[in-house]
Amino acid sequence: GNNIKTVDYLGFSDAYGEGWWNEFSKIAEARKIQLVGSERFNRTDTSVTGQVLKILAAKPDAVLIGGAGTPAALPQKALKEKGFKGQIYQTHGVANNDFLRVCGKDCEGTFLPSGPMLVAAQLPNDNPVKKSANDYVNKYEAANGKGSVSAFGGYAWDAGLLLANAVPAALKKAQPGTKEFRKALGSSGK
């Protein structure tokens, strides 16, 4: 989609970055997207100019930044400062206010995945997760202050909801501590 036929990758030089590269390269191949490069950077780097110049020379339609947190702002800002006009994609690891603060206007137009709690108020009323997402946001912000919600707490909330539904169903099938209970729990009690 979006007329993206070539992508370059710029990710952390650690297991996180490598994991994203490994998965993304498989998906790109399956989708007939040409990978024109694969660059790495360290979380503590203060410059990625060399990597960005290689990316610009390859002229990709898009760049996927395989990073998380505020360190992922560095390549985004460098790409924009050097004139990259293509689409930039980030991972779910940047779905937080600290990243937005550090990246500033250079983040505008970036695509990234996120759970619904970060956009709960913007979801249509008939969205099946709007009520649960708003419930989480309201409870979290009541305890921690307005604007404090993050995607990461939402993932734990989701896990809690799954357990709240799976445990009663598993208890109907087996006793806690047994192999049967673990099996029932792992299949949401079905």
Explain the meaning of each model-derived region.
Residues 1-190:
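Extracytosolic ligand-binding ectodomains
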